[in-house]
Amino acid sequence: MKILFTSLLFVMAGLSVGAQENLTYQKPPKEILELVDVQRAPSVSMDSKHMHMLLMYRNAYKTLADLSETELKLGGLRINPKTNISSTVTYVNNLKYKKLKDKEPLQVKGLPQNAKLANFSWSPDETKMAFTNTTATGVEAWILDIPTLEAKKLTEATLNANIGNPVTWFRDANALLVKMLPANRPALINTADAIPAGPTVTVSDGTKAQNRTYQDLLKNKNDEANFESLTTSELQKVTLSGQKSAWAPAAMYSSLSFSPNGTYIMVTTIQKPFSYIVTLDRFPNKSVIYDNIGKVVTTFNEKPLIEDMPKGFMAEEKGRRDIGWRADKPATLVWAEALDGGDPAVEVPFRDEVFELTAPFNGAPRGIVKTINRYSGITWGNDAIAILSDNWWNTRNVKTYIFNPSDASRKPEIIADYNYQDVYSDPGNFDTKRNQWGRYVLNMEGNNAYLTGDGFTPKGQFPFIDQFDIKTKKKTRLYQSKYTDRKESINSILDIKKGEVLVQMESKNQYPNYYINNIKKQKPTQVTFFENPFKKIENVSKELIKYKRADGLDLTGTLYLPAGYDKTKKEKLPMIMWAYPAEFKDKNSAAQTTSNPNDFTYPNYGSPIYWVTRGYAVLDDASFPIVGEGKEEPNDTFIPQLVADAKAAID
């Protein structure tokens, strides 16, 4: 929870009950309203070649009508039962299209009136975009044809979008696999009026276990029945002309994942029994492999209900987890299994092992690599090269390995070993590119791969691109940003031979825009031209300040002062300080600066920045580190350090 300090105490006294009953929603003062009631710049979705841009426009905030709609909280989900989609969705209300190097965007044609668009998904050939539109009665499936910029409705409002994206493209891009509401769906139970048939019974078997507190849990049999009704769908194949055909019968479908070549699909369904102490991601589930016409190939995995986990953040479930398709193969499943029983207290040389199984999935799984820490992912290259990462929360350690996925006898080589909170030592992430199956694999030129990093240093933030020689393991810096008057963020490498890189640039008063930066010629070319919607605070003073805690720990915060404030007079102002305590395992990491004074000033929901227009000083994102070195945990001295952090900022 964020901590808000203010020098003013607001007291409401002497208000009668009648006055409270007659109170209506109020508009904020003019200075704040001018920052709230603005047309914000769109978000951007690009194809893999970064040639086509879809501009997505949203309202800045939800309306009171949106916030007043019916909401059911079940099993970790928040659902609008009238429309069958998550009640937390932020909708898009308009779409425009732009070629990367064109200056002006074009309006998409054929969109519905009062559009409430969500669940966007590029087709495998990237010539179309699927999305949903939410009406007063439900969710429709739509597609956008990129060459013509024509949007078209495919279905009526019969989709079930209560769990995840309800539309999934077939590999040929000629049809969608859609979650539909069942024909004979049971009516929901009104839990406020329903009389229970019996008591709610939970069983304790005496097993020692640790569980966190979850929100929105199931509470009784009526909740169970409603959860099952709301999450049950039928799968139908819907062509681009709108023709529908049954694909799979009603079940609680949680995820659908086609193999890279589109021949197979892994279908995961929620099973019973449900739980009253954990959310749906810990409910039993079953993963079945189908072919692309809906015929069952094999049951790949059955996960039981997981209510009990070992103690610790690095505890894991037993059995197969993190199941997915290998990106560089047509149809190979990959997953991890804990070698320590999922218990971080067990001392073992390797925590996890990664396995693979190739279609038709009737052979024995093959172990391909083991990890010292807990497995966290693989970036695939080819038969001989892949990049593996693991992590261990207790020490904040991250390791990156290069390994040969075809030869498990060859020991993986560690190429990075660092504390992930030590941002000054972060080596960056390997750049990827889309392959023939539409999956992202290592971006390689000969023996070279490429890393892009945020570039935090003691002197500021300077993002970089490194060339990594896979044979020699040596790195060569190809580019490092030198801007001190603006912030540059590396988005993607477009063409390493030409030196073309897609970046974003911004400053305190310049909205983030995309540029093509030729790193060989050091010449950026602007490709989007989004305007600053918050010009009313252009003259506000913004400064990254540095100060020390009583024990000498370096701290930072972003200080905003009202426009026209004369610093030389040192006139006292009421101040709002906004902070979030963060845990660290060493003082070196805790003292590092991760803020950039050139970040665009973006007042969003819950931001204290609005109040600088009302004469307040605002200290935003003040450092509140809680350090526990060695065997000492941060929580051991949480309160004293919290007080010291606040005192340092105020003093």
Feature annotation, model-predicted:
Residues 7, 19-523, 529-539, 554, ...:
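Beta-propeller folds
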Residues 271-272, 328, 379-380, 384, ...:
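Serine-hydrolase catalytic core recognition
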Residues 16, 145, 615:
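Conserved functional loop/turn residues at catalytic and ligand-binding sites
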Residues 3-15:
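Sec-dependent N-terminal signal peptides
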